[in-house]
């Protein structure tokens, strides 16, 4: 018996991508944005099909993503931001609510929401994950969005 496998590809179908970006910790976040845009363009997405929407911080990203998803104008949303642990419980609240909110948007609207929000213990970890030795999590989120758009298109065609 041959098992059938359905999986997404990184070939960019015609589609529009919204990058919802938290401005807080911008010294890290801008590297994530550059990585995401570069990955999308390298995989065939036209720059005219990429929109960057800036929110104040990670906590606000889910609401902005929800409004974007409601519009129905984008095939995927790529959430980018950075939450760096400090000396108070603030980190847990912001990171947790951002994560839950983005998952809820994806499930409620059926739009892929790729998670590129860094939740790290230190500035050093944030820098490592935004383009140095740990790669660029913005680029990884963009690839995840491409793959999900492709996968969902295949599932909807069945």
UniProtKB/Swiss-Prot annotation:
(2S)-2-hydroxy-3-oxobutyl phosphate binds at residues 87-88, 129. Its EC number is 2.5.1.78. GO terms for cellular component: cytosol; riboflavin synthase complex. It comes from the Bacteria. Gene3D superfamilies: Lumazine/riboflavin synthase. One of its GO terms (biological process) is riboflavin biosynthetic process. The active site is at 90 (proton donor). Disulfide bonds: none annotated. Belongs to the DMRL synthase family. This is 6,7-dimethyl-8-ribityllumazine synthase. It comes from Pseudomonas putida (strain ATCC 47054 / DSM 6125 / CFBP 8728 / NCIMB 11950 / KT2440). The gene is ribH.
